[in-house]
A protein has these predicted regions:
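Internal metal/ion-chelating core segments
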Residues: 101-168
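Alpha-solenoid helical repeat scaffolds
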Residues: 31-34, 69, 103, 141
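Residue-level recognition of tetratricopeptide repeat
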Residues: 2-6, 44, 78-79, 112, ...
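Structural register within alpha-helical repeat arrays
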Residues: 10, 51, 85, 123, ...
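Inter-helical turn/loop elements of alpha-helical hairpins
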Residues: 1-46, 50-62, 88-100, 129-133, ...
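Flexible helix-coil transition and linker loops at the boundaries of alpha-helical arrays
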Residues: 32-46, 73-75, 106-116
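Asp-box/WD-like beta-propeller blade repeats and closely related beta-sheet repeat scaffolds
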Residues: 65-69, 75-78, 83-89
Length: 168
């Protein structure tokens, strides 16, 4: 109950769903997260996630993205921070930012990284959204080899098939 990051995750997850009725859920999570931050020591990553939630609730999703990018500067292998940056960029329509953000951290998602497949799925989606269909397909299929349940990677590959008129 005193872990600020858990409350930030709850709030950011509620906002990602894009439902008006969940804004109050996010706001309550933010209030609790801020109280937790004041009560004890928090890591830099934890503070950044809380700052991202607070910024988005104040109407600044771009600032929330910037805080996730700050978290990635601390640890480029932080796949969940990468996915959150990617997701908020998707919501605001920043297709080139989606691609660049993932490209910046792929060096840390090496072959032995347990979440590499999901990172490849995000990379594939960013590539597809910026018109690089051949590379998007290659990255998406490669990601699906290790993350069979990655709906986002599968979504990226199906977008490629649709955009290249290969729907059969």
């Amino acid at each position: 109950p005193d872990y600020a990051l858990a409350h930030a995750v709850k709030g950011l997850s509620a906002l990602m769903l894009g439902r008006r009725e969940l804004v109050e859920v996010a706001a309550q999570a933010n209030r609790t997260a801020q109280t937790c931050l004041q009560a004890g020591a928090a890591t830099a990553r934890e503070r950044l996630w809380c700052a991202a939630l607070d910024a988005w609730l104040r109407g600044h999703p771009s600032v929330a993205i910037a805080r996730m990018e700050d978290a990635l500067l601390l640890n480029p292998a932080d796949t969940i921070s990468m996915k959150l940056s990617h997701g908020i960029r998707f919501i605001i329509g920043d297709n080139h930012g989606m691609r660049r953000s993932v490209e910046r951290v792929m060096h840390a998602h090496t072959e032995d990284h347990p979440l590499r497949g999901y990172a490849l799925g995000c990379l594939a989606f960013g590539m597809e959204e910026t018109g690089n269909y051949a590379e998007a397909e290659r990255m998406g299929l490669q990601g699906l080899e290790t993350a069979l349940d990655d709906a986002w990677g599968l979504h990226a590959v199906t977008h490629v098939y649709d955009m290249t008129h290969r729907t059969k």
